[in-house]
């Protein structure tokens, strides 16, 4: 029996349940073990809680032998590799885009100036401000139902959340607008899961690897390499999206390329620096580093140093 560690929220158990079911379907008995994390116990702003707030307890459970593997939202994992653990599988990604849930079925552009929009993310807040719509950004914590209720109760005019989370809970009917990357670049690895186990557990790693999706792994690798190079941690105002696309060469042969778009935004929305690049899936990390270097050349370091010392970040 493979014991799979998961956070206790409905979204987390739904995600981990999908991994469990996929393993069982392949003939590998598996069960979920709920682990409470520091992020679940705190009601403070996510960016004030530190990197790894949702993952440390799950990793401790692996290390102590209480579980064999853990399922993380990949974007919650620290960008620095931990030699004690291995990401044995990155399953096929859900939709990485952000989504708006607004009152009266409105889209962002239809909300009047001064409307209250909730988000848990400095990245979303910065890009929302950059749209120049005069929206008032408010902090947002709690599970998805709690967040959605803040709109239905009239407390907020809209919220912006990951579309993947709504999809996994069967709540896509609440979405009033899906934000394309040109409007808002998602968080690196948004919509992707990471299935992690002990680094030395090669037998279990081989079993978990049956769930791995090569295109998703390449995309996530590029996005997180960009994030790591920018030294941003998971709450900094950095967006990135990569995808494997088919191209045709001069001889009419189809081949795969990996495209990557990235951005760094000033927290007040006064500036958004964007860069993009194309590489191959086999050199995903190099593509991430290349686009990060271009962002630095365009002034990302100055923008990010301002973000790190912004009092709104609490650090």
From Swiss-Prot:
InterPro entries hit by this protein: HemC, Porphobilin_deaminase_cofac_BS, Porphobilin_deaminase_N, Porphobilinogen_deaminase_C, Porphobilinogen_deaminase_C_sf
A GO cellular component term found in this entry reads: cytoplasm
Cofactor binding description = Binds 1 dipyrromethane group covalently.
Entry EC number(s): 2.5.1.61
Q: Which GO terms describe its molecular function?
A: hydroxymethylbilane synthase activity
Residues the record lists as S-(dipyrrolylmethanemethyl)cysteine modifications? 234
Cofactor(s) listed: dipyrromethane
Q: What does UniProt give as the signal peptide span?
A: none
Task: List the Gene3D superfamilies.
Answer: Periplasmic binding protein-like II, Porphobilinogen deaminase, C-terminal domain
By its UniProt entry, which Pfam families does this protein fall under?
Porphobil_deam (PF01379), Porphobil_deamC (PF03900)
List where the protein spans the membrane: none
Q: Which UniProt keywords apply?
A: Porphyrin biosynthesis, Transferase
Keyword Transferase appears in the UniProt entry: yes
- Spell out the reaction equation it catalyses: 4 porphobilinogen + H2O = hydroxymethylbilane + 4 NH4(+)
GO biological process terms held by the UniProt record: protoporphyrinogen IX biosynthetic process
Pathway listed for it?
Answer: Porphyrin-containing compound metabolism; protoporphyrin-IX biosynthesis; coproporphyrinogen-III from 5-aminolevulinate: step 2/4
Q: What role does this protein play?
A: Tetrapolymerization of the monopyrrole PBG into the hydroxymethylbilane pre-uroporphyrinogen in several discrete steps.
> Whom does it interact with, and what assembly results?
Monomer.
Q: What else is known?
A: The porphobilinogen subunits are added to the dipyrromethane group.
Q: Give the family per the record.
A: Belongs to the HMBS family.
Which protein are we looking at?
Answer: Porphobilinogen deaminase
Source organism per UniProt: Mycolicibacterium paratuberculosis (strain ATCC BAA-968 / K-10) (Mycobacterium paratuberculosis)
Q: What taxonomic ancestry is recorded? A: Bacteria, Bacillati, Actinomycetota, Actinomycetes, Mycobacteriales
Question: What is the gene name?
Answer: hemC
């Amino acid at each position: 029996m493979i014991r799979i560690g998961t956070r206790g929220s409905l979204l987390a158990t739904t995600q981990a349940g999908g991994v469990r079911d996929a393993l069982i379907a392949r003939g590998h008995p598996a069960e979920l073990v709920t682990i409470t994390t520091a992020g679940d116990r705190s009601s403070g702003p996510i960016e004030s809680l530190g990197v790894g707030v949702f993952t440390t307890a799950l990793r401790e459970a692996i290390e102590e032998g209480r579980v064999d593997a853990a399922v993380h939202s990949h974007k919650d994992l620290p960008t620095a590799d931990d030699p004690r653990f291995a990401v044995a599988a990155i399953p096929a990604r859900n939709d990485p885009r952000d989504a708006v849930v607004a009152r009266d079925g409105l889209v962002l552009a239809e909300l009047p100036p001064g409307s209250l929009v909730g988000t848990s993310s400095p990245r979303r807040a910065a890009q929302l401000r950059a749209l120049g719509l005069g929206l008032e950004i408010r902090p947002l914590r709690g599970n998805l139902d709690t967040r959605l209720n803040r709109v239905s109760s009239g407390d907020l005019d809209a919220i912006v959340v990951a579309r993947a989370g709504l999809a996994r809970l069967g709540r896509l009917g609440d979405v009033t607008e899906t934000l394309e990357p040109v409007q808002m670049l998602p968080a690196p690895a948004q919509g992707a899961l990471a299935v992690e186990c002990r680094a030395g557990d090669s037998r279990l790693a081989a079993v978990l690897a049956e769930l791995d999706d090569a295109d998703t792994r390449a995309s996530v690798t590029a996005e997180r390499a960009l994030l790591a190079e920018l030294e941003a941690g998971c709450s900094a105002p950095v967006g990135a999206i990569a995808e494997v696309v088919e191209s045709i060469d001069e001889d009419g042969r189809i081949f795969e390329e990996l495209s990557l778009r990235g951005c760094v935004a000033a927290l007040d929305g006064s500036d958004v620096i964007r860069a993009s690049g194309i590489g191959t899936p086999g050199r995903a990390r190099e593509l991430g580093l290349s686009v990060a270097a271009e962002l630095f050349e365009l002034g990302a370091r100055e923008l990010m140093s301002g973000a790190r010392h912004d009092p709104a970040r609490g650090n």
